[in-house]
């Protein structure tokens, strides 16, 4: 069985322009505060109350991800949500190449890496 791959900020930075789907699962208020990593897609998973419309989210996800083995990098604030979501995608939906940004966007910013606001 596949498992979630932890990627450091430097590893993620090297993937920015590759054929990798990067999905930021944070909320809009979080995007506004920190920005997002270049070329990542905003796809909020949990709302402020911890709720998620899973069918709608999965529909958007499946439009971005072309195959079950395509590399997907999930991003959140501190890598807590992304581990949960990655496990869900691997165990319940058969994805085999799911990674997440170790330490989340907080770690990315702590290392002085850039984000974009859009």
Where are these regions (language model features)?
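Rhodanese-like catalytic fold shared by cysteine-dependent sulfurtransferases
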Residues: 1-20, 28-71, 80-118
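Short, surface-exposed ligand- or partner-binding patches at beta-edge/loop junctions that are enriched
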Residues: 74-76
